[in-house]
Each structure stands twice: as C-alpha cells, then as structure tokens.
Swiss-Prot record:
Keywords: Aminoacyl-tRNA synthetase, ATP-binding, Deafness, Disease variant, Ligase, Mitochondrion, Neurodegeneration, Nucleotide-binding, Primary mitochondrial disease, Protein biosynthesis, Transit peptide. The gene is MARS2. It catalyses: tRNA(Met) + L-methionine + ATP = L-methionyl-tRNA(Met) + AMP + diphosphate. Its EC number is 6.1.1.10. Pfam families: Anticodon_3, tRNA-synt_1g. This is Methionine--tRNA ligase, mitochondrial.
C-alpha cells in the first residue's frame, strides 16, 4: 500500500523529470481559486486590502490585513512567470467626518493630518516587506474622477433620488443604523445614551435632505449572487452571516451628507450642497487603482480578491456588490474575511493602553519573524490573541530550532566537508519500499517523509486557495519536524565519509534533507521572503529555480538527473534565524491565572 501511495504521489516511471507542478499544478486549482482562477499562469489576479482610515496610527490588525494580501499575492506570483498579471493594492481612506473632527481636535488642516498618517502606513508597509503594486489615497485627483463618474453612472440608471433621511448615524463608524441596531447604554452618572449594537460607539439622531441609493432593490440579486457562488465570501461562516442579513428587508441607503455638516470629502457632481458618503467614496478605490473609468479597468475586474476585517463585512458584502450591480458591473470574485487581534484577551484600545505598535514588533522580532508569527497564528474564523511570550516561543521553536537547526546540521563542514549537494544513492534508498539487500538503508518512515514532502506544494496551494495560510504554514512546520526526525534517526554525524559502506548512505541522507529544505524554502517565500532567500541561497538555488514550476522534488529517487547534485552550496552567512532572548522586558505579558 505504501509503495503504491509513494509512486502515485511522487511521479511516474518513464518521466524525463519529476515535476510537482505537472502532477499537482494549476490544473488542480479550482476555478474560484484566490491565486490563479484558471489554468493559465498569466490569467490576471487582483488582490486588495481595505484602505485604512487615517484617524489613528497603524496597529497590528492593519498589518495583518496587509500581510494576508501580500502572502496571497506572492504565492500567486510563484505559480507563473508573469508578475505583470498580478496586482496588489492597499492605501488610505482620507475623507469623512471622523477625519474632519480629528484634524480640528489636533489643530491641523485635514490635508496635513492625512499626509502625516498616510505616511505612517506607507513606512510600515515598506518596512514589513509588503509588495503592493499600488498605494491609493482617496484624496488623489484620479480617485475623485473615478468616484464622480461612478456616481454619475448610478444616477443615470435611476438608482439615486433626493429625499429626507431621518435616523441614527454613527460618526465613529461612518454609517447609518436602523432602530433595531441601536441600544441604550448606561452612562457614568446614571443616565443612558444610544450606541451601536455592532460596535458600541455612540450614535446621534440625524434628519437631513440627502441623496439616497435604492438599496432595497438589490436584496434578491444579492441573495442570488451569494447562493450561486458559495465561495464568494470566505470563510464560510461569514458567507452564512451575510445571507442571514439578507433574510431581512434592505432599507434604502443615504449616500450623501450636507456639505455644511461634512465638507471634507468629494462633492456630489452638480450639487455642491452635498458631499458623497465616505463609504461609497472609499469602496470605489478598488476601481480607481485599475484605471476606472477608462476601459483598461475591465481587464482586471472582477478577478479580484478583497481581504477585509470582519468589522467592515456589511460594507463589502452588501453595499459594495449592490453599488456594482447598480452600475452594471459584476461583484468581486472573492471577499476574504478575517477576524481581529486581541491583546491578552482584550480588544485593543487607546483607553486601555494596550495598542501594540507593529513597527516595534518588526524591530524586536525581525521582519520575517513577525510576518511568520501573524500569518502562522492568525486564524481568519475567530479572534486571535497576542502577547510577547507567544511570539518568542513560536519563533524560537519553528524558525530558530526546527528549520534553522536542520539547515545548520545538513550544511555544517563537519558533516558535509565538501560543501556540496551530495549524490543520492538509489541502492541505499530504492524507489520500491520493502526491498531487502545489503545496501538498502531506507526505512518505512523515510518513505512516509518523501510522500509528505512530495505532496506538500499541492497541499499548501490548496490552503492558499481557501484562505487558510495558517494551515499552509502548519503543514510546512509538520514536514520540517518529520525531516528533523529523519536526520535524527539516521544520525549522519555518526557516519564516515571514508567508509565505502557509510559514504553512499551519508550522502543520501544529506541529499534528501537538502531536497526537503529546498521545498520548504520555496514554499516559505510568500511569508518570510528574506529568510527563504537566505535558506535557498545557502543551498545554491538560483533565482530562476525558485518558482513552483521549478520545484522538482527528489528526481534521483527514480534515477533521473538532479540539477543540484554535486553543486557547491552557497556561502555560509550565519544562523538562519537567531534565537530570541526571552529575558528581555515584554511589550505585552500574558495574564497569569
């Protein structure tokens, strides 16, 4: 049974080369995949983060959104030769009442506040290695053109009318709320005040003449879209939540405010007395980036994956698709939703003083280390908790000890004095398990390792396609542990290169371990790009050999040539990931019970 499994997973005899991309490549990716969408490598893919509000400095939740999109985009680039077929946008949302009020409180002009905070986001993303192709600011002239054109399309299709809106408005969330979404909260002096049930932020009663979007017309079209596209919103629980929202009637939506009340925004075309609602303004950024309203945007839309936090799900899963349908356009291909980061079980809050500065974390834990932590520990389905001890424990265990230790052991001069990729001996490790002979040294567990690593790229790709990057890293970590077990089991440091009996098996053990490391390094590129580069460079893997299309694993297992066999390793550059010092003062300690 094991032999059949290994042969099926590792390739077919008679093949000129063992190609994992051939056996487990794009033809296995679903048509709704995040990374490809079709079999062709040059099919366009467009990844977006939310544009981040500039009323406060960036925190780790913002960085997490950007890292999810970055890893998805980087993995997509590994799958094909054309990086021009991939776009990745992020940016800042700079209009609205909150910005207007925050600037006034700080004694700044709104433009000055926006410039200052937008620069903080740009610096953070540059330091964190976010590989965005576009950084959009909603104060840019190109965006104003796009928003006003989009408004004109909605108006020309009879979807905007002027009327008196009367109801609850939450300035903090920049949204209107029905009565059912408002509750009374006790105040410190015993009186009560109205707040949003969803966010807990205060709301106020508003009555004014606005432009109103006929959202009520789109309830059934939205239901048909979601029921016909079960992967449109992922993970599945969020898809279910949106369908539950759509069980209720959708009220028409106010999409402007009086300019006398809100002047910091984009004016309604032909009516300077009104300012376009900040969420309609903000959502159009996804079109601005790809050239809307020029025809070029059609080559990118709707091949889009929006990565968003769960707090803005309604805006992206109901309002935005309704706006698009109203404008005669398709909804986005995929909306990927993630939950929040808490700190020691509590929501991050300025008042609690527990907001974690991501730039401090990048400096303390290294860029690759903190990227790995957030993507390894972050689970989109539910909130994840942050504290420093968890970061140190994970990075020391998985990057410093398991992965770094494996690389050091297999490339150390004492074990590999020639500093080359040793030869693989097919008589020591035959492709048929269970063979008996004086030269056969491979054990059943060794075939299980080969099988696990051979299927790893396909498994990782499936996890990326299903927005489970944490599962992809879990799978890589599991194979790293298996490979360490393989090396420990055969103890190459006890074998002698001078012995005609030991030497072929010693070379084979190192060859298999280095091949496993090459797979790990290739698959870690989207998450830890610098660390992966260091690992692959140490193995002597050139830049042109690092895509999934070049990931031929263990071809000598079938006696086919291996391009790395006999190749000199790259230069020694120190530890792959130095262990973190646990004696340092924690930024955030875990609560002790």
């Amino acid at each position: 049974m094991l032999r059949t499994s290994v042969l099926r997973l590792l390739g077919r005899t008679g093949a000129s080369r063992l190609s994992l991309l051939e056996d487990f490549g794009p033809r296995y990716y679903s048509s709704g995949s995040l990374s490809a969408g079709d079999d062709a490598c040059d099919v366009r893919a467009y990844f977006t983060t939310p544009i981040f509000y500039v009323n406060a400095a960036p925190h780790i939740g913002h960085l997490y959104s950007a890292l999810l999109a970055d890893a998805l985009c980087r993995h997509r680039r590994l799958r094909g030769p054309s990086t021009a077929a991939t776009r990745f946008s992020t940016g800042t949302d700079e209009h609205g009442l909150k910005i207007q009020q925050a600037a006034a409180t700080a004694g700044l002009a709104p433009t000055e506040l926006c410039d200052r905070v937008s620069e903080q986001f740009q610096q953070l993303f540059q330091e964190a290695g976010i590989s965005c192709t576009d950084f959009i600011r909603t104060t840019e002239a190109r965006h104003r053109v796009a928003v006003q054109h989009f408004w004109g399309v909605l108006k020309s299709r009879g979807l905007l009318y002027k009327g008196v809106y009367e109801g609850w408005y939450c300035a903090s969330d920049e949204c209107f709320l029905p009565e059912a979404k408002v509750t009374q909260q006790p105040g410190p002096s015993g009186d009560s005040f109205p707040v949003s049930l969803e966010s807990g932020h205060p709301v106020s009663w508003t009555k004014e003449e606005n432009y109103i979007f006929r959202l009520s017309q789109f309830r059934k079209p939205l239901q048909r879209w979601l029921r016909g596209n079960p992967q449109a919103i992922t993970p599945e629980p969020f898809h279910h939540v949106v369908l539950q929202w759509l069980d209720e009637e959708l009220p028409d939506l106010s999409v402007s405010r009086r300019s006398s009340h809100l002047h910091w925004g984009i004016p309604v075309p032909g009516d300077d007395s009104q300012t376009i609602y900040v969420w309609l303004d903000a959502l159009v950024n996804y079109l601005t980036v790809i050239g809307y309203p020029n025809a070029e945007f059609k080559s990118w839309w709707p091949a889009t994956s929006h990565i968003i936090g769960k707090d803005i799900l309604k805006f992206h899963a109901i309002y935005w698709p309704a706006f698009l349908l109203g404008a005669g356009m398709s909804p986005p291909q995929r909306i990927c939703v993630h939950s929040h980061w808490t700190v020691c079980g509590q929501k991050m809050s300025k008042s609690l003083g527990n907001v974690v500065d991501p730039r401090t974390c990048l400096n303390r834990y290294t860029v690759d280390g903190f990227r790995y932590f957030l993507l390894r520990q972050g689970v989109p389905n539910w909130d994840c908790d942050y504290y420093d001890e968890k970061v140190v424990k994970l990075l020391n265990s998985e990057l410093a000890d398991a992965l770094g230790g494996l690389l050091n052991r297999c490339t150390a001069k004492r074990i590999n004095p020639s500093e080359t990729y040793p030869a693989f001996c097919t008589t020591c490790f035959p492709s048929e398990p269970g063979l008996v002979g004086p030269s056969v040294r491979a054990q059943a567990e060794d075939y299980a390792l080969v099988s696990a690593v051979a299927t790893l790229p396909k498994q990782v790709a499936d996890h990326y396609d299903n927005f489970r990057i944490y599962k992809a890293l879990e799978a890589v970590s599991s194979c790293v542990r298996q490979t360490n077990g393989f090396v420990q089991r055969h103890a190459p440091w006890k074998l002698n290169w001078e012995s005609p009996v030991d030497a072929p098996w010693l070379g084979t053990v190192l060859h298999v371990a280095l091949e496993c490391l090459r797979v790990f390094g290739t698959l870690l590129q989207p998450v830890t790009p610098s660390l992966a580069d260091k690992l692959l460079s140490r193995l002597g893997v050139s830049a042109s050999e690092r895509s999934l299309g070049e990931l031929y694993f263990l071809p000598r297992f079938y006696g086919h040539p291996c391009p790395f066999e006999g190749r000199r390793l790259g230069p020694e550059t120190g530890l792959l990931f130095p262990r973190l010092d646990q004696s340092r003062t924690w930024l955030v300690k875990a609560h002790r019970t």
